[in-house]
Amino acid sequence: MSSNLAYLVYESMTSGLSSVSFYVLDTSNNQHPFHVLVTSENTYYYFDSSESVYIATSFNISVNGNVILTVSLNNLQKTGNMTLIVVVTLDIGTSLPGNLGTYVIQAIQALFAGVLINLGCSATAYYTIVNEQTGSSSTGSTGLSFSLTNDSQFVASGSISYSQYEVVNITQIIISCSTINVKENMITNTLTSSECTSSSGCTYTITITFTS
C-alpha cells in the first residue's frame, strides 16, 4: 500500500480523484461489489451481504480505474447465506507541514471510506534576484507544475531565468489548496543558485520531490 500513497496524494492534491470502488474477483474474473463500514479511525470493514454465490480469489480497491490494493482471499467460498468481510487497517503518516499534512491524511482516510476529496492545490515559488556587481535586486514569483513520476513519487517543478552576474534566492515555496483554504511553506531555509556567468543568461530549476 505504501508504494501507492504518493499516487493517491498526488491525485487528491491536483483534484484528479474521479472514482473509487471496492470489489472481489471470483475464479471467473467477475467483479462483486463490496460496501464499506467505518467503525473506528483507520479501520475499514468491506463486506458483501448479498445472496451471491462465488469463489473469491481477491479483494481489490481501485482508484480512477487503477488497483491500489489487493488482498488475496485464497479461493474462499461465498455462499448465499453468508456475509463476506474484509478488514483493512491504515497506518499512514506524512512529512507535509502543518495543516496541509493533516488534510492530506484526512483525504486518504476518506478515500478508503468511498468519499472523494479533491484538495485543489497549487505551488508557487517566491524569489529575489540579486545582481552581485551592482547590488540591485528584484522580487517575483513563478508557478510550479505537479507531475507524477511513478506510483511512489511526484514532483512540483518550475524554472526561473536570470542574467549574467545575478543570483536567485528562493525565499518561499507555498502550496495552497483552494478546497480547504490552506497555505503552507515547503522550505525552512532559503535556496540559492550559483551566480550566472553566461552573457546569454541562465536558468535556475526548482524541484520539490514527494515520495512514499
Swiss-Prot record:
User: Its domain of life?
Assistant: Viruses
Output this protein's name: Uncharacterized protein 58
